[in-house]
Each structure stands twice: as C-alpha cells, then as structure tokens.
Amino acid sequence: MAQKERSDHNDSDERRNESGGEFIDKLVHINRVAKVVKGGRRFGFAALVVVGDQKGRVGFGHGKAREVPEAIRKATESAKREMIYVPLRSGRTLHHDVEGRHGAGRVLLRSASAGTGIIAGGSMRAIFETLGMQDVVAKSLGSSNPYNMVRATFDALKRQMHPRDIAAQRGIKYSTLQARRQYIVGMEE
C-alpha cells in the first residue's frame, strides 16, 4: 500500500503558473511524513518542485505542510527565490561535460548533438525540461534519492561555464579558444 502511494506521486507534474507568468513548475517528488505525538501520529507532506523559464533559468524548492497543495505552493515559492542561470550552447545543450555531487548523489551531464533529445531519468529530466534544454545525456551514478539527485544536478549546472569565461580565465582570446575547439572537433570526425 505504502509503495503504491509513493509511486503515484513520483511522476513529474508540469503546470503553468496560475498568474500566467513565464515560469513552468514541475512536481518532482512528494513524501508523506508523520510526527508521533502523545495521541498518535500527525501526518504531513513534503514536496520537491523544480521551476524554470525554459530560457536558461531554473530553481528548486522544498516545501512542507499538512496538506499537499500547500506544500507544493511553498516549494514553488522557494524555488522561485533560489533560481540560477545556466549558459546554454545554441540555446539547447551544455557547453561542456560536467559532473556534480551532493551527499551520495553523483550525476554526469554530457552535451549532445542536435536531435538527441533529453536522455535522463527521474528528477533530472524535470530540471532539463524546465531549464529549456533540448539535447543532453545525463547519468545518475550514485544515490537515486530525488533530493540528492536534484542537488547534485544543480551542483553540476553551477559548474557550467561559458567559453568566454574560460578564455578570460586562461588569458586567451575567445576566438582562439573557438578555433582550437573547431580543430579538435574536426579531428574527431
């Protein structure tokens, strides 16, 4: 019985905000929790929500309440406050491969060629869809706990750097970096 309840709530739920805003939110995970008191148990709900504008901004939030809709609302508000910007190559994929970690959760994100689609499981797919990413390959290498997977994915996305920033750190021109990249890509084919 408890296993069935959990699997029903694991599916991503996509919604446009009621205010007609530019954000899309997806319910990643909902968990029923219990507080043991003198008279028995008091049940509540914890929700994990991902919010994004499909243009490179994304955030996640965690909300807890006695009722499911209130927990989702709190999580959505928290996600909107904690949004990050991720630079995308051609507005569709990552600039470079990156790994993220949180606790026992470890994820590997790889850029993909056009037409590949989002190859990711569970909570990572919700993040990429709300982010506006169209082509990416992602693999969860550690914990499958949705909270750790989301935080590990955000850790990886925060490590994503635009080539202009990389060129500035190395002290070379952006055009030189791009020329090297074209040369390497040409060698692989």
From Swiss-Prot:
The answer to whether the entry has keyword Ribonucleoprotein is yes
Recorded GO CC terms: small ribosomal subunit
Q: Which Pfam families match?
A: Ribosomal_S5, Ribosomal_S5_C
The residues covered by the S5 DRBM domain are 23-86
Known partners and oligomeric status? Part of the 30S ribosomal subunit. Contacts proteins S4 and S8.
User: What NCBIfam families has UniProt attached to this entry?
Assistant: rpsE_bact
Q: Anything noted about its domains?
A: The N-terminal domain interacts with the head of the 30S subunit; the C-terminal domain interacts with the body and contacts protein S4. The interaction surface between S4 and S5 is involved in control of translational fidelity.
Similarity comment text for this entry: Belongs to the universal ribosomal protein uS5 family.
Give the protein's function. With S4 and S12 plays an important role in translational accuracy.
Spell out the protein name for this chain.
Answer: Small ribosomal subunit protein uS5
Q: Which organism is it from?
A: Bartonella bacilliformis (strain ATCC 35685 / KC583 / Herrer 020/F12,63)
- The organism's taxonomic lineage, starting at the top: Bacteria, Pseudomonadati, Pseudomonadota, Alphaproteobacteria, Hyphomicrobiales
